[in-house]
């Protein structure tokens, strides 16, 4: 191990001490040794990805951390290790990477330690961009091109033309990113870059096989396609030919480096006559179209998708006017790579609509909302028809649709709702489609020029604006543009800039169906779109008010956004009004935060959606909004699942108090257990924390149980006095409510509901005796209490209990220590003893608390302990060891004044 540096050994030793074997293996695989990662470490990590109890996010975070090292060797090896796991590891690993907002932000990486560092830094930047692109394409396609079946019955060979036209540009983008590695044989001078080159070489062969299958599929169906599709297919084929040359050059390098020729495929180009034939066919289609501008062109495409829609000729006339905007060809833009869509948008536009309609939008025209969802259900639809193409196509489409704007505006507002209108069927289809498209379009393209995102986020869920939204999302940001999505993007632009900028206040359904939610007010939409938006604004305003949190029920439907899984099934919920469940925890990656319906409660807290990168619920969450108070502070806490990777908690616009408490609690949870417990504000919501501490896989894949709504209690509301009582609230959701301090029925009710902070507050005040209800007792006790408080126990006891309860410290020892006191209802007696126990709420909390947090608490205890001792016996009682009986007698003398108050009240 001579190549290892001292820092390598120290890092490995640190992880060994903390018991993280996976993190240790990552460190071992990414040492400063100038050689590729060792097979034994890679094999260990691959095996780890297949274990159900391994924390994939933690593994990925450790790799990202190593990739921030200043040494090119460590960074390069971290990239190689990540690539190896993406290729050979369990698919959960690449799924998680695809769900992240950012991966490798190494676009500016430079190791100035030596000339070798300069050279290697160049390849590190290119390599990281390819890995980002690989994860991004997985996010859009929901499968890895390198893993899917190839050949005559492979995925690309059997894919429908519409989907194929959308997926080919994505595949092209991934191949381009790989070819940009552009290494020469004389630059493969060390084991690290050699290891990377081998992985790239193997990837290229698999990707090119898919590419070839896709082109074959296109050519087989070329003569059956509509004009717009033919144009796109021809453009894809031309690009294929140019890439073929570059691929052959890459393979030559592999051959020179010594890779067995048997492993290198021979590429033979098709005869040039094929290209001529394809162009002639396209020209014939073009020739027919001018003669009968809409007649032949539009009907044929329409007829293909749904003959009945040929009636849409009236729409076609507006389309003609649209012709002026040539580049709009939906499919062309869909190919993203192909701006050629010079074909007259008019027919293309119509063609587009029918295509989508066939996909499910047009068919759904009558039952609009549900059908689009149904259509979308096929992942292909998401990929091929709407979402993928939407990125680029929607924007253009939006402009085109402008001509329709006057007519569609009403339909658009009702787009998904009333697409049924036959006359506007095509136009509405477009809008509905765009909405669906936006599903992925905005979500992924959404590096929505941060500014537009804010507008999009706007709560107004104007359905029509989806087009604008998509437009915004894609405006200037071509999802396929080489720069976009690369590590180079700023953190906000993150590779998948899917999350709306945190700034967007609109909690509504910003991400899921960002496009639909786009408020008409969004300034970003193209002027044309703006007009449409303006027209629709009135209607949308009404709709928005009705669906406020439901976020335009239709819009929420797209939440099926989960890229991986139900992701494609945008459940018909779209039509459904605010289904709280809307694609609830479909999200493979949704953390509890996403799956827990309570979040939706208050639209404001919902903003946490930014945190939920992929969580469908983030979008759907608003629908559950029916439960007002649940806006659990925890949502952010849950998010911590990924270690605050998304840092959403901070940005969430939850009520200030809630946000603060929740964010601190959750962040602290994962940040450092000890520290978090000390934090006074951490919300006591234990359920969420339990989830946080779980292996995370459940949470990661949406299986985690939604945190109990009862936990929604917001500790921050109770400030000073509440600190003592707060613990009782924490256990509220937990099984042993009996031990709760507040015996009053009102209190119990508030606990159970956990939804009405005001009522719970009032009940707490009543218990304290501050309210008029117990004026006599309260006043007397309060005065006496104050005297004691001044005694000096004042500051200690108060603070300690608060931190304990908030920190979820109820450790098992504490339980044992106070069992009699707390287990018995404080009212029962044990005046002083019972009160402190209840006040701290330790036992109850302990019962419900996750075991994991408890241990950390134990570590924190010593720190809390001295203050307790100083304060008086009560502190000692808190310590785990003392026996409850002996402690209780001692307590009375120094018992907390507040505790005394409560007991008397109960008596």
From Swiss-Prot:
The modification Phosphothreonine is found at residue 317. One of its GO terms (biological process) is regulation of clathrin-dependent endocytosis. The modification Asymmetric dimethylarginine is found at residue 865. The modification Omega-N-methylarginine is found at residue 865. Belongs to the PICALM/SNAP91 family. It is found in: Cell membrane; Membrane, Coated pit. This is Clathrin coat assembly protein AP180. It is a peripheral membrane protein. Residues 893-907 have a biased composition (Basic and acidic residues). Residues 285-326, 342-380, 393-414, 505-525, 867-907 are annotated as: Disordered. Residues 302-324 have a biased composition (Polar residues). Residues 516-525 have a biased composition (Pro residues). It comes from the Eukaryota. GO terms for molecular function: 1-phosphatidylinositol binding; clathrin heavy chain binding; phosphatidylinositol-4,5-bisphosphate binding; protein kinase binding; SNARE binding. GO terms for cellular component: clathrin-coated pit; clathrin-coated vesicle; extrinsic component of presynaptic endocytic zone membrane; synaptic vesicle. Residues 14-145 form the ENTH domain. The modification Phosphoserine is found at residues 296, 300, 306, 313, 596, 602, 623, 629, 763. The keyword Cell membrane applies. Residues 505-515 have a biased composition (Low complexity). Thr-310 can be modified by the addition of N-acetylglucosamine which can be further phosphorylated. There is no evidence for direct Thr-310 phosphorylation. Possesses a three domain structure: the N-terminal 300 residues harbor a clathrin binding site, an acidic middle domain 450 residues, interrupted by an Ala-rich segment, and the C-terminal domain (166 residues). Adaptins are components of the adapter complexes which link clathrin to receptors in coated vesicles. Clathrin-associated protein complexes are believed to interact with the cytoplasmic tails of membrane proteins, leading to their selection and concentration. Binding of AP180 to clathrin triskelia induces their assembly into 60-70 nm coats. Binds AP2A2. Interacts with AP2B1; clathrin competes with SNAP91. Glycans are attached at residue 310. Keywords: Cell membrane, Coated pit, Glycoprotein, Membrane, Methylation, Phosphoprotein, Protein transport, Transport.
């Amino acid at each position: 191990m001579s190549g290892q540096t001292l820092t390598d050994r120290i890092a490995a030793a640190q992880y060994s001490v903390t018991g993280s074997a996976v993190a240790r293996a990552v460190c071992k695989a990414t040492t400063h040794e100038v050689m590729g990662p060792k097979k034994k470490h890679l094999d260990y990590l691959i095996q780890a990805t297949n274990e159900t109890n391994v924390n994939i996010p933690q593994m990925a975070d450790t790799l990202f951390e190593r990739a921030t090292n200043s040494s090119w060797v460590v960074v390069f090896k971290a990239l190689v290790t990540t690539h190896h796991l993406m290729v050979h590891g369990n698919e959960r690993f690449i799924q998680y990477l695809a769900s992240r907002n950012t991966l490798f932000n190494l676009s500016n990486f430079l190791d100035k330690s030596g000339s070798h560092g300069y050279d290697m830094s160049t390849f590190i930047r290119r390599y990281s961009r390819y890995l980002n692109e690989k994860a991004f394409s997985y996010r859009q396609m929901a499968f890895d091109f390198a893993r899917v079946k190839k050949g005559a019955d492979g995925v690309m060979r059997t894919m429908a033309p519409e989907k194929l036209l959308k997926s080919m540009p994505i595949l092209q983008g991934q191949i381009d990113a790989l070819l940009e590695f552009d290494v020469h044989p004389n630059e493969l001078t060390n084991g690290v870059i050699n290891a990377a080159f081998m992985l790239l070489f193997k990837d290229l062969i698999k990707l090119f096989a898919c590419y070839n299958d896709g082109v074959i599929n296109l050519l087989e169906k070329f003569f059956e396609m509509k004009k717009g599709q033919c144009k796109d297919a021809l453009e894809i084929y031309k690009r294929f030919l140019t890439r073929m040359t570059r691929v052959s050059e890459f393979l030559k390098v592999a051959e020179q480096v010594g890779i067995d020729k048997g492993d290198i495929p021979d590429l033979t180009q098709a005869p040039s006559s094929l290209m001529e034939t394809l162009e002639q066919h396209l020209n014939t289609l073009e020739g027919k179209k001018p003669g009968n501008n809409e007649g032949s062109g539009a009907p044929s495409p329409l007829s293909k998708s749904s003959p009945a829609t040929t009636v849409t000729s009236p729409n076609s006339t507006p389309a003609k006017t649209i012709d002026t905007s040539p580049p709009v060809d939906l499919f062309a833009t869909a190919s993203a790579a192909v701006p050629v869509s010079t074909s007259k948008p008019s027919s293309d536009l119509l063609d587009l609509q029918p295509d989508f309609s066939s996909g499910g939008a047009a068919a759904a025209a009558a039952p609009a909302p549900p059908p689009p969802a149904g259509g979308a259900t096929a992942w292909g639809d998401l990929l091929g028809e709407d979402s993928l193409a939407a990125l680029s196509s929607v924007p253009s489409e939006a402009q085109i649709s402008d001509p329709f704007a006057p007519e569609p505006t009403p339909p658009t507002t009702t787009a998904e709702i009333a697409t049924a209108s036959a006359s506007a069927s095509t136009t509405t289809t477009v809008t509905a489609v765009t909405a669906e498209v936006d599903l992925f379009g905005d979500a992924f393209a959404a590096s929505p020029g941060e500014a537009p995102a804010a507008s999009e986020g706007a709560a107004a869920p104007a359905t029509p604006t989806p087009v604008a939204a998509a437009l915004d999302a894609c405006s200037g940001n071509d999802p396929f543009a080489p720069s976009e999505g690369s590590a180079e993007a700023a953190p906000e632009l993150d590779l998948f800039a899917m999350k709306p900028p945190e700034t967007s206040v609109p909690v509504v359904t910003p991400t899921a169906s960002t496009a639909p939610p786009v408020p008409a007010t969004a300034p970003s939409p193209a002027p044309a779109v703006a007009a449409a938006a303006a027209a629709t604004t009135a209607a949308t305003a009404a709709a928005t008010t009705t669906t406020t949190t439901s976020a335009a029920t239709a819009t929420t439907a797209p939440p099926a956004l989960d890229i991986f899984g139900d992701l494609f099934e945008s459940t018909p919920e779209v039509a459904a009004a605010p289904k709280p469940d809307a694609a609830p925890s479909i999200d493979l990656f949704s953390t509890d935060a996403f799956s827990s319906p309570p979040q939706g409660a208050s639209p404001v807290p919902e903003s946490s959606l930014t945190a939920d990168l992929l969580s469908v619920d983030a979008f759907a969450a608003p629908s559950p909004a029916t439960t007002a108070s649940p806006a659990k502070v925890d949502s952010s806490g849950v998010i911590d699942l990924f270690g605050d990777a998304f840092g959403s908690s901070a940005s969430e616009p939850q009520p200030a108090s809630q946000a603060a408490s929740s964010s601190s609690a959750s962040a602290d949870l994962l940040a450092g257990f000890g520290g978090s417990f000390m934090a006074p504000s951490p919300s006591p919501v234990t359920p969420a924390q339990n989830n946080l501490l779980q292996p995370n896989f459940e949470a990661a894949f949406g299986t985690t149980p939604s945190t109990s709504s009862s936990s929604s209690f917001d500790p921050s509301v109770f400030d000073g006095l509440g600190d003592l009582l707060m613990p009782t609230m924490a256990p509220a959701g937990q099984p042993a409510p009996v031990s709760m301090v507040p015996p009053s029925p009102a209190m119990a009710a508030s606990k159970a509901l956990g939804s009405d902070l005001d009522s719970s507050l009032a009940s707490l005040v009543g218990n304290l005796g501050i309210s008029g209800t117990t004026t006599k007792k309260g006043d007397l006790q309060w005065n006496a209490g104050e005297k004691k408080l001044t005694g000096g126990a004042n500051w200690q006891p108060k603070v300690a209990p608060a931190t304990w309860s908030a920190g979820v410290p109820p450790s098992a020892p504490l339980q044992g220590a106070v069992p009699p006191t707390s287990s018995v209802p404080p009212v029962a007696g044990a005046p002083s003893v019972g009160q402190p126990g209840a006040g701290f709420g330790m036992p109850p909390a302990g019962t419900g608390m996750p075991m994991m947090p408890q241990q950390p608490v134990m570590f924190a205890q010593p720190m809390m302990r001295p203050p307790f001792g100083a304060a008086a016996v009560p502190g000692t009682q808190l310590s785990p060891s003392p026996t409850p009986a002996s402690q209780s007698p001692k307590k009375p003398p120094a018992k907390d004044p507040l505790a005394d108050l409560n007991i008397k009240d109960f008596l």
